[in-house]
Design a protein with these regions (language model features):
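Carbohydrate-binding surfaces of carbohydrate-active enzymes
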Residues: 58-71, 79-87, 93-94, 99-100, ...
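Aromatic-lined ligand-binding clefts that engage carbohydrates, nucleic acids, or primary amines
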Residues: 341-360, 398-400, 470-494, 501-502, ...
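Hydrophobic faces of well-ordered beta-strands that scaffold small-molecule active sites
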Residues: 21-25, 84-88, 119-121, 139-141, ...
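Aromatic- and acidic-residue-enriched carbohydrate-binding clefts of CAZyme catalytic domains
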Residues: 1-3, 31-56, 225-242, 247
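Aromatic-lined substrate-binding rim segments of carbohydrate-active enzymes
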Residues: 1-34, 107-112, 116, 225
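Aromatic- and glycine-enriched glycan-recognition loops and surfaces
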Residues: 1-13, 101, 340-348, 377-384, ...
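Noncatalytic carbohydrate-binding groove/subsite architecture in carbohydrate-active enzymes
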Residues: 99-196
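An active-site-proximal structural segment forming one wall of the substrate-binding cleft
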Residues: 3-23, 46-83
Length: 547
């Protein structure tokens, strides 16, 4: 993901385009991003308490800010840059914490690192001052309706100060297994946006431009903090958000409505530039899968770790002692004698989905429909139990492949991935010990160096990789990878994981921007959990459908 980390270049472009910039510098950013922006290796500190003045957490935040903030300070408006404002934390009132000393520490760190622009917090105004300190910060509001009520609350909290809607939600995001979110109609968007402008209040549309959770960087949501594990909802790779500009940069009805309202309420009439053409898109011809690589062969290329019992992926001793952050973890037990009618029990909850194989044969149910998320192999079930086989098998190899489907971004903090709750995994009434554990991370260098591929046969069942070639004769343009014929997995283009797909919906396509493609041959690899299709198709737009 290093190509996406050019912060200084991004800020230079904003300055060149004469834009003002508001920075949400963290350490928690929410944004439905994986773990709210926290790196998973923080979980290895047993005494850490996220989003508090806990010394361990503050130590890590300090180290982070001491690198990040000097970069940002150089781009402040007072230094000739575009940054006019810094948002401190995000919606702290619903964090499950109430440690205002923590907010003071963040402010001090920012001031000590040369930040001089306006510092603000952002919360739902009905929370009052629970997540802010009015004497230190300007409080802004996050909402999408009841505009006058919310802005009046902001005025009451901080009389004599300007009001700002920091997040005016113009749309919403999608969960896997849910319907495509259309809860903000054009009429609702227009009415509430105009109410803000009429008030008058400053306003930032969230999101103005839909985005993409490339790789494994989608977050997850829980609607009930007290019962979060039963209410886990993974967020799609697409963060299209039904925004004025969609994920691929196309204009929507909300864009034209926004333009019209800004022209109406802008007291300074200026000549507006013409609207640029939308980026070109195409539906490339379908490609045929040519090769396949099964899980057993994939794992031969990975250095395993050995453990008496199953452990969370973050606790695996890889990546220079930082553990595994993303992808999948495979728990393997060899030479296992399985009696007839044996049951496998995974104690606690699986985090987040699991496939079970015996001697390379998938024996667990497929996750094809939204209803399947309430069955075996998901985090919604406590002590998942599965009939392994009706017949006895001697000397078997048992594989449990667990997917990290995205960490919850707000409200839950000690959330490890893999199998780690309870006391382990049981075969009938006996715990299974002495595991071989493989971190399956899908790093680019590993993916592009794989060998041992065999010819594609199309009748494979279970987790495997499939490869085809997309040949582009001219300069590449944006496209959408259309995966409705497949079941569940990830798509990798030229070694880069562009995101996840799931036939259950609501979205059946993955946005593939032109810069990730090249003229000539493009390697398209699919890691499919259950059953492949013979082809990968393309569209020139997103496709939504539910199963």
């Amino acid at each position: 993901m290093s190509d996406f980390l050019h912060l200084e270049e991004f800020l230079k472009i904003a300055q060149e385009e004469d834009l003002f910039t508001i920075i949400r510098s963290g350490p928690f950013i929410c944004a439905e991003f994986e773990f709210g922006g926290h790196p998973s290796w923080l979980l290895r500190d047993n005494d850490i308490e996220f989003r508090t003045s806990n010394p361990t957490y503050v130590k890590h935040v300090t180290n982070f800010f001491n690198v990040l903030l000097p970069i940002l300070a150089a781009f402040q408006f007072t230094n000739g840059g575009s940054i006019i404002m810094f948002q401190v934390e995000n919606e702290y009132s619903i964090s499950g914490k109430h440690d205002l000393e923590y907010l003071k520490i963040l402010r001090t760190l920012m001031l000590n690192n040369g930040i001089v622009e306006l510092l603000v917090t952002a919360d739902n105004p009905n929370k009052g001052t629970y997540g802010t300190l009015p004497e230190l910060f300007l409080m802004t509001g996050n909402f999408d309706q009841q505009v006058k009520t919310n802005l009046d609350r902001l005025k009451a909290i901080q009389p004599g100060r300007p009001t700002m809607t920091m997040e005016f939600w113009g749309g919403w995001f999608d969960y896997w297994g849910d319907e495509h979110n259309k809860n903000k109609t054009l009429a609702e968007f227009q009415y509430n946006y105009e109410e803000i402008l009429k008030y008058p209040s400053s306003v930032n549309i969230y999101m103005f431009h839909g985005g993409t959770n490339f790789g494994f960087l989608n977050g997850a949501e829980n609607l009930n903090f007290d019962e979060w594990e039963t209410d886990y909802n993974s967020i799609t790779s697409s963060y299209e958000y039904v925004a004025p500009l969609d994920e691929a940069g196309d204009y929507t009805d909300k864009y034209w409505a926004t333009k019209e309202l800004l022209e109406k309420y802008n007291p300074i009439k200026t000549a507006l530039p013409s609207v640029p053409e939308a980026p070109q898109k195409t539906a490339y011809a379908s490609i045929t899968m040519e090769q396949e690589l099964f899980l057993y062969d994939m794992l031969q290329t990975i250095q395993p770790v050995y453990a008496k019992n199953v452990i969370a992926m973050e606790k695996i001793e890889v990546n220079n002692g930082n553990g595994q952050s993303y992808g999948y973890v495979v728990y393997r037990k060899t030479n296992l004698n399985i009696p007839e009618n044996a049951y496998l029990k995974i104690e606690g909850r699986i985090c987040d989905t699991a496939m079970v194989l015996i001697n390379g044969i998938l024996v667990s149910p497929w996750l094809q429909k939204a209803a399947d998320l309430n069955g075996f192999g998901t985090s919604r079930i406590v002590d998942s139990t599965l009939l392994l086989t009706k017949e006895a098998i001697q000397g078997a190899t048992l594989d449990i492949v667990v997917e990290n489907w995205g960490r919850v971004n707000v409200g839950v903090y000690k959330q490890f991935k893999g199998i780690w709750q309870g006391n382990g995994v049981k075969l009938n009434d006996e715990y299974i010990y002495d595991w071989t554990i493989y971190p399956l991370e899908f790093k680019s260098a590993w993916t592009t160096s794989l060998t041992g591929w065999s010819n594609f046969l199309s009748n494979s069942i279970g987790p495997a990789m499939y490869k085809g070639n997309l040949y582009i004769s001219e300069n590449p343009v944006d496209t959408f990878v259309y995966m409705e014929k497949w079941i569940k997995g990830i798509v990798i283009v030229n070694g880069f994981v562009i995101g996840r797909y799931a036939r259950m919906g609501p979205i059946q396509t993955l946005y593939l921007p032109a810069p990730l493609l090249r003229q000539g041959n493009n390697e398209i690899v699919v890691f499919e959990h259950f059953r492949p299709s013979a082809t990968v198709d393309f569209q020139n737009h997103h496709v939504y459908n539910n199963y």
